[in-house]
Regions:
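Mobile "lid/hinge" segments at catalytic clefts and subdomain interfaces of large enzymes
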Residues: 2-29, 36, 203-311, 479-540
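Small-residue-enriched alpha-helical segments and adjacent helix-cap loops
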Residues: 2-7, 74-77, 99-244, 274, ...
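Acidic/polar, glycine-rich intrinsically disordered N-terminal extensions of enzymes
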Residues: 1-96, 205-208, 556-559
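Flexible, glycine/charged-enriched surface loops at secondary-structure junctions
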Residues: 129-133, 166, 204-211, 283-301, ...
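Short amphipathic beta-strand starts and helix->beta connectors
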Residues: 82-90, 117, 121-128, 281-284, ...
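Long hydrophobic segments that form regular secondary structure
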Residues: 332-335, 340-349, 354-381, 527-561
């Protein structure tokens, strides 16, 4: 007779293979792995040029259309007129429009005036005037027809730009500091490492089939969101070896947020590409390929921890130990470079805030004209949907500010315009549930009118991030006020667009995922009322020097509703 204490244990289930190549698990375990195994994604470029652009949209195969074309920076955009409530119920082909979103990768965010003019012209000629500055230094177009892609590529490549691997399971655009090479506090300009990686590894077939996307940040200043990238190199001075970079691995947001872990290693500038490449190969070989929602590097790093990750990196991929090193400094607040700031050469950099990154081809052409009038040939895009013009002489600053404002670029913005971000949203994204870009524009206008009397009482802007779905392209978990789009039931019992609220998130010194308000959602039409209510309560209840995030994390939930 078996007693309770002798009850047999349940049979332990055999762990399913995760598709880790390092373990010899090469059989594709999901549809994405199948199409990548059937034909290398980079091969789609030839079909676009030789077949699809000539024969039209209907000639595109399904696995190219919804799979491999991502490696060329292209997604089909959302068919117009389909409401967010149908996002999860319709088949992919029912959501597909016959036009594409196209993402131009701009590694380091660095552009010349000539390149900007080309980007503006493409928007006007092929994208119905659309152009969005993303939070990864890129430019995104919409309404791109397949027939126009060869000419767009020709124009981009003529000025050193491209769309290669701007999307897909590959090495995405590398974030860099928008003030690299010009900021007075910068000790090392990381641009050579970014340029080397782009020139030598992007488009390498050996690195073009990763388990999921791989995002990088390489910057001396901590102004390129290092905490939420797959790999980050952040500037730090080693007490014995001088300036170099602190290595951090395994960050990412999406539906489950992870902050990158320090490996405790210091990397000199000349070794950054080598360590970056070794990490990409580690991810390629050891990363999980069974479930798409667990295939990012962050899940492997979570399972391994920092020590094992470093040990495998050193032993299997570098063949040598890394030097131990100190942690990089962390900023107390977001560094967005908006406003007028002195460069190390005595000239000025001027940062501008379009609302949630939205602009147009005509506006970008106007920016190029304004730069030319100011004597500037260089600009940068930021990790916060902003634009920075470099090399502006003192006597050209005010004219530049005045010229840029009517173009939608404000160099002295309200705190609401300055700190509001939004993803693409329902207008064009097939994953979205609610609209975001226009909602952000309307919200900023509303807050500028309703809360202007509080602007001077805010030591730092309150970051408001709007996302059209749970995937957090607009980083809702690390915003002061993060708004995750969903369909909600309003007080009248109607299904309407709304948002789940996250409060008190942050990067830098305030590195924390925002608290989610349980059972509290806000209708899109009531966002202005909600933000006014919670900001007013913060102003009234805050302690001396207390930020919005600090207050939101300690406040009673009723105060936050």
């Amino acid at each position: 007779m078996t007693t309770t204490s002798e009850r047999p244990r349940a049979t332990q289930r055999t762990a399913k293979p995760e598709g880790q190549w390092a373990k010899g698990e090469f059989d594709p375990l999901n549809p994405n792995e199948v199409f990548k195994a059937e034909d290398a994604p980079l091969n789609v470029r030839a079909r676009i040029l030789e077949q699809y652009a000539r024969e039209g949209f209907d000639s595109i195969s399904g696995t190219d259309l919804r799979g491999r074309m991502r490696w060329m920076g292209m997604y089909t955009q959302r068919k117009q007129g389909i409401d967010g409530g149908k996002t999860a119920t319709l088949a992919p082909e029912e959501l597909d429009d016959e036009y594409f979103m196209m993402r131009v990768r701009i590694d380091g965010g660095q552009l010349s005036r000539e390149q900007l003019r080309v980007l503006a012209g493409i928007s006007t000629d092929f994208a119905r005037g659309t152009a969005d500055i993303t939070d990864r230094n890129n430019i995104q177009y919409h309404w791109i027809a397949i027939e126009d892609v060869p000419e767009i590529w020709r124009r981009l490549e003529a000025v050193g730009l491209d769309t290669l691997e701007a999307c897909g399971d590959c090495t995405r655009t590398t974030l860099g500091s928008p003030v690299a090479g010009v900021h007075p506090d910068e000790v090392i300009d990381a641009t050579p490492a970014i340029d080397f990686i782009k020139a030598n590894y992007v488009g390498d077939p050996d690195l073009a089939n990763l388990p999921r996307k791989f995002k990088s940040s390489i910057a001396w200043l901590p102004d390129a969101a290092p905490e939420i990238n797959d790999i980050s190199f952040v500037g730090v001075v080693h007490p014995d070896h001088g300036p170099g970079f602190d290595l951090q691995i395994g960050g990412g947001l999406s539906t489950k947020a992870f902050f990158a872990l320090r490996l405790g290693a210091w990397v000199p500038l000349e070794e950054v590409p080598e360590v970056w490449l070794a990490t990409v190969k580690l991810f390629r070989d050891h990363g999980y390929r069974r479930l798409r929602n667990r295939a990012r590097l962050k899940y492997l790093v979570e399972d391994w921890g920092a020590d094992k990750t470093r040990e495998v990196l050193e032993r299997e991929y570098l063949g040598r130990p890394l030097l131990d090193g100190p942690a990089a400094p962390t900023p107390k607040h977001t560094i967005d470079h908006v406003g007028v700031h002195r460069q190390k050469d005595g000239r000025n950099l001027v940062g501008f805030a379009p609302i949630a990154g939205r602009t147009s081809g005509a506006a970008l052409a106007g920016v190029a004209d304004a730069m030319e009038a100011a004597g500037s040939d260089r600009l940068r895009l930021t990790a916060y949907q902003k634009l920075v013009v470099l090399d502006v002489p003192d006597d050209a600053v005010e004219p530049l500010l005045e010229t840029m404002r009517p173009l939608g670029f404000d160099g002295r913005p309200s705190p609401w315009r300055r700190a509001t971000m939004a993803c693409t949203g329902l207008e064009f994204c097939k994953l979205a549930i609610v609209e975001t870009k226009q909602r952000a524009h309307d919200l900023v206008a509303e807050l500028e009118e309703r809360l202007a009397h509080l602007d001077d009482q805010l030591e730092h802007p309150i970051a408001i991030h709007l996302n059209g779905c749970p995937n957090s392209c607009a980083r809702i978990q690390v915003a002061d006020i993060g708004l995750k789009g969903q369909i909600i039931t309003d007080t009248a019992g109607e299904q309407v667009p709304g948002y789940q609220v996250h409060l008190g998130g942050g990067l830098g010194e305030d590195l924390v995922v925002g608290r989610k308000l349980r059972a509290h959602k806000v209708a899109a039409s009531e966002l202005g009322d909600y933000v006014e209510r919670v900001v007013t309560r913060y102003i009234a209840a805050r302690e001396s020097g207390e930020s919005f995030g600090d207050w939101a994390r300690r406040a009673d939930e009723e105060e936050l509703r």
